[in-house]
């Protein structure tokens, strides 16, 4: 091959290329978010994925409602997940307390497996 002709010229897609739409991508548009706090009281890091049912996470994570009151029954977390991009996670080091945004699980609102606390359709 010589000179300026290349199979990888500007404007052509190449293997692995990502072609984004113009404008902004809005995540979870129209979904009501709540901001709560979560603290890791354990002695190991805990990482929670984007679509994990928060009600069923590791028991070393302590939840605080929007007013900062400890929520021992995890009512604030029932039927909710983190308001973060799909495939990402939030990591809590031992002793970490973080403010996080949470939203309702969508779709059929069924939770199966995890810690076996729901195993079916969510009640609310």
Curated annotation (Swiss-Prot):
Xref: InterPro entries: Urease_beta-like (IPR002019), Urease_betasu_sf (IPR036461), Urease_subunit (IPR050069)
Subunit organization: Heterotrimer of UreA (gamma), UreB (beta) and UreC (alpha) subunits. Three heterotrimers associate to form the active enzyme.
MF GO annotations: urease activity
Protein's name in the database: Urease subunit beta
Designated gene of the protein: ureB
Keywords tagged on the record: Cytoplasm, Hydrolase
Superkingdom to which the source organism belongs: Bacteria
Family, similarity comment: Belongs to the urease beta subunit family.
Record pathway: Nitrogen metabolism; urea degradation; CO(2) and NH(3) from urea (urease route): step 1/1
Membrane-crossing segments per the record: none
NCBIfam families: PRK13203.1, urease_beta
Subcellular location: Cytoplasm
Catalytic function, reaction form: urea + 2 H2O + H(+) = hydrogencarbonate + 2 NH4(+)
GO aspect biological process, one term: urea catabolic process
Signal peptide segment: none
Cytoplasm among keywords: yes
Phylogenetic placement of the source organism: Bacteria, Bacillati, Mycoplasmatota, Mycoplasmoidales, Mycoplasmoidaceae
Species assigned in the record: Ureaplasma parvum serovar 3 (strain ATCC 700970)
